[in-house]
């Protein structure tokens, strides 16, 4: 909290008035971009629960961590909340049936990223039979039992990476966690589901945050962007109601992209940098998403596994933008036109995710997964279709890179297959936020080229490791 002092002169009375104003400090980082927000399309629309009209879902077998193996087969009857795929690996998360019904088939299906992966298709029976866990008091159980509950609930991060939460909350013994950062920034354009969640069910968010704080013994910090300042009093009231104002602090961060990135939040709030090749936990911080906090609360209070996803459906070609909750595995095309109305003629781009980090999809026949925060139907006015031209050497990509990397130099090194040089330039540290491509006047798809380069680096490293073992 900053305190500003002013003297105001009133000429009619020839007097001075002393004024003291309290102003909340705004935290930020160097670089980043300011794209058009486009949040007004869905910001004021309440969240509604929706069931797929066909009553059929297609659930990816793996949605975070090591590959799962199906525990059911075609023809099996399942109930809502039943585990249908799991792994014995530590870094993994089970997958549960989101409706009750019958397993129709197990096979490859299109998912986000235009990949085809193993999925379990369930035909719902409309009975809504459930197999939830017994509720568990998070403040009267051991950390071991709490972590087991989170793992059994299949909770993964809902901010994009879908990393298993029980692993994230259980760092090496020599690592002290000082802060759980609740990421309420929601910095990417169009997406408003976190905003609506914080506005409509703040008690679930704060409860989930407190549970994660209890497990780790950390303090809590809520990072709220300054374009969502109307949520401040709502969150303050909830914190006071839970009598935890000594343990949870709200900090206002500047509204820009990619403010919601793990690394950028830690840099903004605590001026700490994640080491090259390291993990955020090495800074003493764990960043968790608003939706993840809600899932944690539900797992303990209701015994409910992560079988639903709250998301925004929006874009200029979406005639009825919505914030909805759907069963995990709901096929996007199944929501059209009964749930959302889309102008197919105006749609030139379909995205799973936001406009900067989302995947461009070839079809709407893909399932909403645990990590799907947004589906966008964009018009030609919303999409940059200008052709790529050679780099003009302006350096704008370097100016906006939040990590201080040189994207154009990295891409140049990758172009001539100089993997070693690209590595020294920090290619593996890139968070693929897309700021460089957004600002590039030459329309060079920098982040796509870097993403491919990172894959090549990983393959080369794996090859060297295999060669060394041989």
Predicted regions located by residue number:
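Ferredoxin-type iron-sulfur electron-transfer modules in oxidoreductases and energy-metabolism complexes
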Residues: 373-388, 398, 402-470
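Conserved mixed alpha/beta catalytic, RNA-binding, or beta-rich assembly cores of soluble enzyme
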Residues: 87, 150-163, 173-205, 215, ...
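N-terminal, Lys/Arg-enriched amphipathic/low-complexity engagement segments
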Residues: 21-71
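Short histidine-centered loop motifs in beta-beta connectors
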Residues: 68-77, 81
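Hydrophobic alpha-helical positions that pack around
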Residues: 185, 219, 223-332, 338-344, ...
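Short, positively charged and aromatic/hydrophobic N-terminal segments
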Residues: 8-20
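Conserved hydrophobic positions within beta-strands
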Residues: 101-103
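Acidic low-complexity segments
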Residues: 105, 110-163, 172-174, 229, ...
């Amino acid at each position: 909290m900053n305190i500003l002092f002013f003297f105001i002169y009133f000429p009619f009375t020839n007097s001075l008035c002393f004024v003291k104003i309290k102003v909340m400090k705004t935290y930020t980082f160097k670089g980043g971009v300011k794209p058009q927000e486009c949040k007004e399309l869905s910001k004021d629309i309440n969240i509604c629960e929706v069931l797929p009209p066909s009553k059929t879902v297609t659930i990816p077998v793996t949605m975070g961590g090591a590959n799962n193996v199906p525990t059911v087969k075609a023809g099996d009857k399942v109930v809502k909340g039943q585990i249908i795929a799991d792994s014995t690996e530590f870094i993994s998360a089970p997958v549960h049936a989101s409706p009750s019904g019958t397993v129709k088939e197990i096979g490859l299906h299109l998912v986000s990223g235009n990949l085809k992966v193993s999925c379990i298709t369930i035909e719902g029976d409309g009975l809504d039979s459930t197999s939830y866990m017994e509720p568990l008091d998070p403040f009267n159980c051991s950390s071991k039992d709490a972590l087991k509950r989170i793992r059994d609930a299949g909770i993964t991060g809902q901010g994009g990476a879908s990393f298993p939460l029980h692993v994230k909350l259980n760092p090496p013994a020599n690592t002290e966690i000082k802060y759980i950062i609740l990421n309420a920034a929601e910095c990417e354009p169009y997406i408003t589901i976190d905003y609506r969640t914080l506005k409509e069910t703040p008690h679930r968010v704060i409860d989930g945050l407190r549970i994660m704080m209890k497990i780790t013994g950390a303090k809590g910090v809520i990072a709220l962007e300054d374009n969502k300042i109307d949520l401040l009093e709502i969150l303050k009231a909830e914190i006071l109601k839970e009598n935890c104002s000594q343990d949870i602090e709200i900090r206002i961060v500047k509204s820009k992209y990619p403010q919601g990135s793990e690394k950028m939040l830690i840099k903004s709030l605590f001026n700490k940098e994640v080491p090259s090749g390291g993990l955020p936990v090495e800074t003493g911080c764990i960043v968790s998403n608003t939706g993840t906090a809600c899932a944690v609360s539900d797992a303990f209070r209701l015994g409910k596994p992560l079988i639903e996803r709250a998301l925004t459906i929006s874009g200029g070609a979406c005639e009825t933008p919505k914030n909805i909750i759907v069963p995990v595995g709901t096929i996007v095309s199944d929501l059209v036109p009964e749930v959302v109305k889309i102008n197919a003629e105006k749609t030139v781009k379909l995205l799973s995710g936001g406009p900067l980090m989302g995947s461009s999809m070839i079809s709407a026949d893909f399932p909403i997964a645990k990590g799907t925060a947004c589906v966008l139907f964009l018009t030609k006015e919303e999409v940059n279709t200008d052709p790529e031209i050679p780099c003009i050497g302006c350096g704008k990509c370097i100016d906006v890179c939040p990590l201080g990397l040189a994207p154009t130099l990295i891409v140049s090194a990758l172009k001539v297959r100089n993997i070693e040089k690209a590595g020294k330039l920090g290619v593996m540290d890139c968070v693929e936020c897309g700021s460089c491509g957004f600002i590039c006047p030459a329309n060079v798809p920098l982040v796509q080229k870097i993403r491919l380069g990172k894959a090549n680096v990983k393959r080369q490293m794996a090859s060297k490791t295999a060669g060394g073992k041989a």
